[in-house]
A protein has these predicted regions:
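A short acidic, amphipathic alpha-helical/loop segment
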Residues: 28-31, 50-58
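Structural recognition of the beta-strand scaffold that forms the well-ordered cores
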Residues: 16-19, 37-42, 64-67
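Loop/turn elements at helix/coil->beta-strand transitions in domains of secreted/extracellular proteins
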Residues: 12-14, 35-38, 60-62, 95-96
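Core dinuclear metal-dependent hydrolase active-site scaffold
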Residues: 1-33, 104-117
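Binuclear metal-ion centers of metallo-dependent hydrolases, dominated by the metallo-beta-lactamase
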Residues: 57-117
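A signal for specific C-terminal beta-sheet/loop modules enriched in small/flexible residues
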Residues: 28-44, 76, 80, 84-85
Length: 117
């Protein structure tokens, strides 16, 4: 499964995109109409926050989470600051999509909800 892109759809119609391959643009063309709820995508160090924001928008995903935290930790890069900038860019563009940088080795529950304020 190395270097492969695919989408998993749960029984509840929740779509998870796993984008690890190099043909990202072609992959986007195939899954854009599916509008994944969650995009898991490796974040290459040379990607500017604008590039990652573009990828989220190209995919049409609601939430994006990075893969491969080890590269950032090895270089002491602050991925929280990086993804804060990605979210600022998405917000400026009027996108409702957001990137989330999970804490390594911590479990999360991911859901899409509407809650009253």
């Amino acid at each position: 499964m190395f270097n492969l892109n695919y989408v998993i759809e749960t029984k509840n119609n929740y779509r998870i995109d796993f984008s690890a391959g190099r043909d990202y643009e072609e992959h986007c063309q195939h899954v854009r109409d599916e509008k994944p709820n969650l995009m898991l995508r490796h974040r290459i160090r040379s990607y500017a926050p604008e590039t990652f924001a573009n990828m989220i928008e190209q995919m049409g995903a609601q939430i994006a989470m990075p893969l491969h935290h080890n590269n950032a930790r090895a270089s002491d890069e602050d991925l929280n600051a990086y993804f804060k900038r990605v979210n600022e860019i998405l917000q400026q563009r009027g996108s409702t999509a957001r990137a989330f940088n999970p804490e390594p080795y911590k479990w999360y529950q991911i859901c899409t909800s509407i809650l009253p304020e």
